[in-house]
UniProtKB/Swiss-Prot annotation:
The keyword Membrane applies. Residues 1-30 are annotated as: Disordered. One of its GO terms (cellular component) is membrane. Residues 525-648 form the STAS domain. This is Sulfate transporter 1.3. Residues 116-119, 166-176, 219-256, 305-342, 397-412, 463-473 are extracellular. Keywords: Membrane, Sulfate transport, Symport, Transmembrane, Transmembrane helix, Transport. Loss-of-function mutation of the gene result in an attenuation of the source-to-sink transport of sulfate.
Length: 656
């Protein structure tokens, strides 16, 4: 921003002079705030559009390239595997092989359990860890994320689906609606990425996500009490009161002690394995393979003891073979189309939030960048293709991704290795899971969701921002006391409410001068800062829009009234100048201009002059276009608060 100089006379009025005029002795040198060069409407629109949707300049690699090179770069942007695949070597493969085998041992038992969480046959969990990871490996940009079904999305999807169709009485329609929801989840994710609308998921605050995930984890754990205790008749509701009532009411006749012995023993084993892995990072493989070891041992135990004859519930038959096509099962018309769309949008957004958060976390650890919009397209494509190959909503799994990271994965090939292992399982090993007890699946899921209850993050949220803590607790209690969808609705609602509150009620502060400097700061933050006699300086910490313009005007007037009462009580010089520090005011609209005009008229009646300090380019431009700068006088707009104070109070050095 350029600036011009003009001196101030002894009466505090600013008299313009030419830049070439010599400055008089002891005359403060002040700077005029310049209006930025005017742009035509099209250029201004294109600049705003680019900064909003293309701030990362995704087309920069295409500049000054031949048509053939641009075509290749375009293909690589959609399929990053083409770029990194050229540099792939045996050394990278070793790391990916170990990581892929490790996460495969973790995903197989988890997939069976998560499918049951969504009220689907266990084979659909395995299907969902075969096709989607292959698609993501070709299109995704994260090296560390491990793809497959996850607990929270499985619970959410199952809850929403059961609200429409009973899976016990109408399993075929239920399955069709699941595939339809998965299709629209993928379409939603891909559309957000393609149209670069990924910022929409940022409206769900971190605090709300922490609360929602924690509540969902407890809900999932409570749902596993059916398999953990061997209860046959169990509530279909997910709230904590209904679940605990169902558990207690079946205590005398519904619990199976053999089931409890199996589930409790292996849960302790899994927790000890996790503890060992946390204490010694080199032993990360122990908690990774513990679930598969538990499945093998418990299955063998049930088989040789025939515990299933004594009330221990088992998985029973699992079909062999690859994913069958499910394209014809998707609803593209009829009553269930809109229901599938609604469920797909909700589950797709939650899955997207989790995957992007996981991808960014591990990318930061390895110091590389992922493109959020490309990730959304990749996740969307894999779910669209997955819906056509008998898969349900898949996303990035935090537990598997953490194991993948610690196992030393180098590229997305670890997902391909995992898919191959799942493929071999589907072709040859599924009959071996016939005697796998449901109790061990319950123990595995409980062990997997425990880390989702992040107590340390909740405590930190409480310390940092109490309103964030309210959002966190609102989502948490909404999930565990009502339902998953209500908890999600509360999380989104409170997140939006916080945004609206911050937009409509921006902070304002009175500024004072730091002794020995020309710096003006918040007097509450710096108690040593001194007020200037006859001058009130207020900073507005937000853009001034229609949503907050009246509040800003009223808040400034209230500051002024309080200051005048204090000055009158202390018999100090009355307020003659009101300086508004506008550095944080990034923009202003028509309502904001009208609010300043109303403030100016009100100050005139009280014989107080309005002065502005350091308005930014968009603001100063609009002040000139609206002629507000002409109204208050160009000599009342300054580059800094210090210059404004010096100009308004030329005898300041004698008084302070």
């Amino acid at each position: 921003m350029s600036a011009r100089a003009h001196p101030v006379d002894d009466d505090g009025e600013i008299s313009p002079v030419e830049r070439s005029s010599p400055r008089q002795a002891n005359t403060p040198y002040v700077h005029k705030v310049e209006v930025p060069p005017k742009q035509n409407l099209f250029n201004e629109f294109m600049y705003t559009f680019k900064e909003t949707f293309f701030h990362d300049d995704p087309l920069r690699h295409f500049k000054d390239q031949s048509k053939s090179k641009k075509l290749m770069l375009g293909i690589q942007s959609v399929f990053p595997v083409i770029e990194w695949g050229r540099k792939y070597n045996l050394k990278l493969f070793r790391g990916d092989l170990i990581a892929g085998l490790t996460i495969a041992s973790l995903c197989i038992p988890q997939d069976i359990g998560y499918a049951k969480l969504a009220s689907l046959d266990p084979k659909y969990g395995l299907y969902s860890s075969f096709v989607p990871p292959l698609v993501y490996a070709c299109m995704g940009s994260s090296k560390d994320i491990a793809i497959g079904p996850v607990a929270v999305v499985s619970l959410l999807l199952g809850t929403l689906l059961r609200a429409e169709i009973d899976p016990n009485t109408n399993p075929n329609e239920y399955l069709r609606l699941a595939f339809t929801s998965t299709f629209f989840a993928g379409v939603t994710q891909a559309a957000l990425g393609f149209f670069r609308l990924g910022f929409l998921i940022d409206f769900l605050s971190h605090a709300a996500v922490v609360g929602f995930m924690g509540g969902a984890a407890i809900t999932i754990a409570l749902q596993q009490l059916k398999g953990f205790l061997g209860i046959n008749k169990f509530t279909k509701k997910t709230d904590i009161i209904a679940v605990l009532s169902s558990v207690i009411s079946s205590a005398h006749h519904g619990w199976n002690w053999q089931t409890i012995l199996i589930s409790a023993s292996f849960l302790i084993f899994l927790l000890i394995s996790k503890f060992i892995g946390k204490r010694n990072k080199k032993l990360f493989w122990i908690p990774a393979i513990a679930p598969l070891v538990s499945v093998i041992i418990s299955t063998f135990f049930v088989y040789i003891t025939r515990a299933d004859k004594k009330g221990v519930q088992i998985v029973k038959h699992l079909d062999k073979g690859l994913n069958p096509s499910s394209l014809r099962l998707i609803y593209f018309s009829g009553d269930y189309l809109l229901k599938g769309f609604r469920i797909g949008v909700v589950s797709g957004m939650v899955a997207l939030t989790e995957a992007v958060a996981i991808g960014r976390t591990f990318a930061a650890m390895k110091d590389y960048q992922i493109d959020g919009n490309k990730e959304m397209v990749a996740l969307g494509a894999m779910n669209v293709i997955g819906s056509m190959t008998s898969c349900y909503v898949s996303t990035g799994s935090f537990s598997r991704s953490a194991v993948n990271f610690m196992a030393g994965c180098q590229t997305a090939v670890s997902n391909i290795i995992m898919s191959i292992v799942v493929l071999l399982t589907l072709l040859f090993l599924t009959p071996l899971f016939k005697y796998t007890p449901n109790a061990i699946l319950a123990a595995i899921i409980i062990n997997a969701v425990i880390p989702l209850v992040d107590v340390n993050a909740t405590i930190l949220i409480f310390k940092i921002d109490k309103l964030d803590f309210v959002a966190c607790m609102g989502a948490f209690f909404g999930v565990i006391f009502v339902s998953v969808e209500i908890g999600l609705l509360i999380a989104v609602g409170i997140s939006f409410a916080k945004i609206l509150l911050q937009v409509t009620r921006p902070r304002t502060a009175i500024l004072g001068k730091i002794p020995g400097t020309s710096v003006y700061r918040n007097i509450n933050q710096y108690p040593e800062a001194t007020r200037i006699p006859g001058v009130l300086t207020i900073r507005v910490d937000s853009a001034i829009y229609f949503s907050n313009s009246n509040y800003v005007r009223e808040r400034i007037q209230r500051w002024l009234t309080d200051e005048e009462e204090m000055v009158e009580a202390a018999r100090l010089p009355r307020i003659q100048f009101l300086i508004i520090e506008m550095s944080p005011v990034t923009d202003i609209d028509t309502s904001g201009i009208h609010a300043l005009e109303d403030l100016y008229k009100s100050l005139q009646k009280r014989d107080i002059q309005l002065v502005l300090a350091n308005p930014g380019p968009p603001v100063i431009n609009k002040l000139h276009v609206s002629h507000f700068a002409d109204l208050i006088g160009h000599d009342k707009i300054f580059l800094t608060v210090a210059e404004a104070v010096d100009s308004c109070s030329p005898k300041l050095s004698d008084e302070v």
